A protein has these predicted regions:
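Acetyl-CoA-dependent GNAT
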Residues: 19-95, 100, 113-114, 119, ...
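Short hydrophobic/aromatic beta-strand or adjacent loop that forms the aromatic wall/cage
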Residues: 67, 163-167
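Conserved GNAT acetyl-CoA-binding A-motif
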Residues: 120-133
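Conserved active-site alpha-helix within GNAT-family acetyltransferase domains
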Residues: 110, 135-154, 161-163
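Residue-level recognition of the GNAT/N-acetyltransferase active site
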Residues: 100, 133-135
Length: 173
């Protein structure tokens, strides 16, 4: 079910333009604009991380039954995406968070994250975890998760210690 939410554009020039409506909904990962955004996501991972440290899911993996994939759109235009992977009945993992390069700093990632956390609570998850990069390029993502209350933690699920990865978790139960 789609949800429309008003978001402030932020403190850049967009703030002068007012509010915009974002529709966060389950999405087909085979949509051409989604495929392009996911390819951009994977490309940016390869620019900043060695291959053994890239844990992003490809489109085939995002279609598996244990993964729910959402897009954020404004008037049909893709702004960003994110996915929630079920690790078990009480624990989920955030995957494939990506904002379109044309829509960064507008609150898109925050809106997708809030939507996924609401869904995780609805499912009865007690904890949400994630893996992100340790390099400077991933600082905006880490700040987003820190502001949402995520704490740094040890590797979880199948992950192992990696100097290129940081792990975060949020208790929501």
């Amino acid at each position: 079910m789609a949800q429309a939410v008003n978001l402030c554009y932020g403190q850049r020039k967009y703030a002068q333009q007012g509010w915009f409506e974002v529709d966060v909904r389950k999405e087909d990962v085979t949509a051409p604009d989604v495929i392009a955004l996911l390819q951009d996501h994977l490309k940016s991972m390869t620019m900043h991380s060695p291959p053994e440290s890239i844990h992003a899911l490809n489109a085939d993996r995002l279609r598996q039954p244990d993964v729910t994939f959402w897009s954020a759109r404004e008037n049909g235009i893709l702004l960003g995406c994110g996915a929630l992977k079920e690790l078990n009945s009480r624990h989920g993992e955030i995957k494939s968070m990506k904002t379109s390069p044309h829509h960064v700093r507008k609150g898109v990632a925050n809106r997708i994250l809030r939507h996924m956390l609401e869904e995780a609570r609805r499912r009865g998850y007690q904890r949400i975890s994630l893996e992100t990069g340790s390099m400077e390029a991933f600082l905006p993502a880490r700040r987003l998760y820190e502001k949402a209350g995520f704490q740094y933690c040890d590797p979880f699920a199948h992950y192992k210690e990696d100097p290129n990865s940081l792990f975060m978790t949020l208790n929501i139960g």
